[in-house]
From Swiss-Prot:
GO terms for biological process: viral tail assembly. Keywords: Viral release from host cell, Viral tail assembly. It holds the Pfam family PhageMin_Tail. The keyword Transferase does not apply. It comes from Haemophilus phage HP1 (strain HP1c1) (Bacteriophage HP1). This is Probable tape measure protein. The lineage of its organism: Viruses, Duplodnaviria, Heunggongvirae, Uroviricota, Caudoviricetes.
Length: 689
């Protein structure tokens, strides 16, 4: 086979293979595009479904959470009507005080667990009062819920007598007053009663007295420590009677109140205790904790009695509600109102959706049972799902392959592009130059030497430039001599130097005029500012004078004093305005006086006048009357007429010139330009002779 035949064979084979390959590539590309479109549609569909689901869940979440909390309470056996009341109370409390309705309902779970036998609306009342107390005393709902459970366990008999709702309102109100009175907190009071327990109640001590004692003790110690000391005191009262020779019980054998016991101890030992007395009390009561209580409360028996009386008067939550409202954050309240609206709407929707969701869940459960029964069907369903997932993965793989092929094509297109070729050429040239850098340096060095060797041929050009430069120097010297002739042509002619001086002076005058105009505008602005400040300050001073001098018991004298004060204030204001205007006029006069031939006297400012003070009490500030504003004849501005050109003449006469000329090393000083030029000509003639 010849070379030509082999070449024809290769070309033919290439043509036959290229077309099918192009078709395959096009098919792969089309398949990739269809796969990409399908994946986009699937992604958009899934995103839409998920987004709609999340939006619906977000809208229903508040209602779902509230229903869950109500379900927890319902598990304790609470009736449906009580749950409905609890739900409404929770939403109202949330919107009024900015607290979570869900937390409100969940706190009712703890209350119902701790207090058995709450019926009807009592659970909602207990929960609302507990959360109100938590809000007003800066405690958590969980802490106050436990506190209410503890208090109910101690004072269950009182609750039965008053009724659960009335009792909880009384306890909450007294707790709030104690917290406010003794600067403690709901947490501290809860810890105090938790430590005390039922010891005081067993001694038949009223709850108001317990609040008073525990509150006073918390001024110097924690709530739990206060409860411990009070409990130790109660435990030692019975044995201390015999040791101290005092009786701490009444005729019925019941323990006396704390104030009476303290007064008996005070009568025996005084207001304060020394070391020996404290030791004796410790022996009597049996503990240091009891002695600490006595030391703290012994000087405050009168105050303690008043505190107990004030606490005993409280039977509701009016003061507590006011405390809670003062702590409401309006933004939290607005947020909870929005949540409440979503809860109310969502609750009504859930009433319709819950049965449907239960049906769907039941169907799902039945479908699971059916699949467990017919395992073959479950297996084939699994195969179908697996195949669907596999086809989806295959589509994604084809899309990936199409993208890879496209990326490879783009890469080869870039490699074959003019930009890449130029870049490659530059890089190659740089590598070539770096590789043969020594040879290039030798070549450049030789080139420079050869160019320098050829510089002889440039001498004619340099000579031509020298001739031109010499001609220019001759022309410049000639022009200099011509200019010199003007110096002696006329005595009245200015030299070029004098012309520059006059031109600079004229420009300076113009510039000063512009600056004066700007300064005048600034003075006018300052005048307006002064007037504004004077007027406003006068109004303020006048109002303050009215408020200060008015006496309802002596209205006539008050009016006279106010009139005098207002007169002085407004006369001072008028004086300030006049002086500000005079300052601006004097500024204009000063600028006019800077011109030759003008001498206008300045206008005097309005100052205090003793004569005016003697003439009228109303002019106490020294303001003179209108007659004093006129100027005397000697002070009147005198405007003298000036002949034409007198300003220029005056400027010329007032100008002193000093000229200095250095010629050939000789310095000539003179005020006469003609004299300088004459001396120069004499020097030249002497040199020429």
């Amino acid at each position: 086979m010849s070379a030509a035949q082999g070449l024809e064979y290769i070309i033919s084979l290439t043509d036959q293979i290229s077309a099918p390959l192009k078709g395959v590539m096009k098919s792969i590309d089309d398949l990739g595009k269809r796969g990409e479109a399908a994946m986009k549609k699937i992604g958009l569909g899934v995103a839409g479904i998920v987004g709609a689901g999340f939006a619906l869940k977000s809208a229903l979440d508040p209602a779902i959470e509230l229903n869950r909390a109500l379900g927890e309470v319902h598990s304790l056996g609470v009736a449906d009507d009580a749950l409905e009341k609890l739900s409404k109370t929770a939403l109202n409390f949330s919107s009024q005080y900015g607290e979570s309705a869900v937390d409100f309902v969940r706190s009712s779970y703890d209350i119902q667990s701790a207090i058995a036998g709450l019926n009807g609306n009592e659970l909602a009342e207990f929960t609302q009062t507990s959360n109100l107390l938590a809000k007003g005393t800066k405690a958590s709902a969980a802490t106050i819920t436990n506190y209410m459970g503890t208090m109910y366990g101690i004072f269950a008999e009182d609750a039965a007598k008053l009724g659960n709702a009335n009792w909880v309102n009384k306890i909450a109100g007294q707790t709030a007053l104690a917290v406010k009175m003794f600067k403690t907190s709901g947490d501290g009071m809860s810890a105090a009663f938790t430590s005390l327990g039922a010891a005081a109640k067993a001694a038949k001590i009223d709850v108001a007295e317990q609040f008073g004692v525990l509150g006073n003790l918390q001024a110097t110690m924690s709530g739990s420590e206060a409860g411990t000391k009070y409990k130790a005191f109660l435990a030692g009262v019975s044995g201390a009677q015999k040791e101290l020779g005092l009786s701490f019980v009444d005729t019925n054998g019941d323990m006396l109140d704390m104030v009476t016991i303290l007064n008996k101890i005070k009568g025996k030992f005084g207001d304060t205790l020394d070391v020996a007395q404290a030791a004796k009390l410790k022996k009597a009561f049996g503990s240091d904790q009891a002695v600490d209580l006595i030391k703290l409360l012994l000087p405050k028996t009168k105050e303690l009695k008043n505190n107990i009386a004030d606490i005993a008067k409280v039977s509701d939550t009016k003061a507590l509600a006011q405390m809670a409202r003062s702590m409401v954050d309006p933004w939290s309240r607005l947020s909870q109102i929005i949540t409440g609206v979503k809860t109310a709407i969502g609750g009504e929707i859930l009433k319709k959706l819950d049965p449907i969701m239960h049906k769907v869940a039941d169907l799902g459960q039945e479908f699971i049972d059916w699949l467990k029964t017919y395992k073959n069907i479950a297996r084939w369903i699994g195969y179908a799902v697996g195949a669907l997932i596999g086809f989806t993965g295959l589509t994604a793989a084809l899309t990936l392959m199409s993208g890879i092929i496209s990326a490879i094509g783009v890469a080869f297109s870039f490699l074959a592009s003019p930009i890449m070729l130029v870049t490659a050429a530059i890089v190659g040239l740089g590598i070539f130059i770096y590789k043969f850098r020594d040879e290039f340096m030798q070549f450049i060095s030789g080139f420079i030497q050869g160019f320098k060797a050829a510089s002889v041929s440039l001498d004619p050009l340099f000579n031509a430039f020298s001739l031109v430069w010499g001609a220019l120097q001759k022309i410049g010297a000639t022009i200099g001599r011509i200019i010199g002739l003007f110096g002696g042509a006329s005595d009245s002619a200015y030299s070029f130097q004098q012309f520059g001086i006059d031109l600079g002076y004229a420009l300076g005058v113009v510039f000063n005029t512009v600056l004066d105009a700007v300064e005048l505008v600034a003075q006018a602005f300052n005048f307006v500012a002064d007037v504004f400040s004077i007027v406003v300050n006068s109004i303020i001073d006048g109002w303050q004078a009215v408020l200060t001098l008015w006496d309802s018991s002596a209205p006539i004298d008050s009016f006279l004093k106010i009139g005098d004060a207002l007169g002085n204030i407004f006369l001072n204001a008028f004086q300030g305005i006049v002086n500000a205007f005079v300052k601006m006029l004097n500024f204009i006069i000063e600028k006019a006086n800077s011109l030759p031939g003008i001498n206008i006297p300045l206008i005097p400012e309005w100052k205090d006048n003793p004569t005016a003070q003697a003439l009228s009490p109303a002019l106490a500030t020294g303001v003179s009357d209108g007659s004093n504003f006129s100027l005397s004849d000697s002070l009147q501005p005198q405007l003298n007429s000036m002949p034409q050109g007198s300003v220029t003449k005056t400027l010329t006469q007032n100008r002193t010139e000093q000229r200095t000329v250095n010629y050939g090393g000789v310095t000539i000083n003179s005020n006469n330009s003609e004299e300088i030029w004459q001396k120069l000509r004499n020097k030249e003639q002497l040199a020429a002779g």
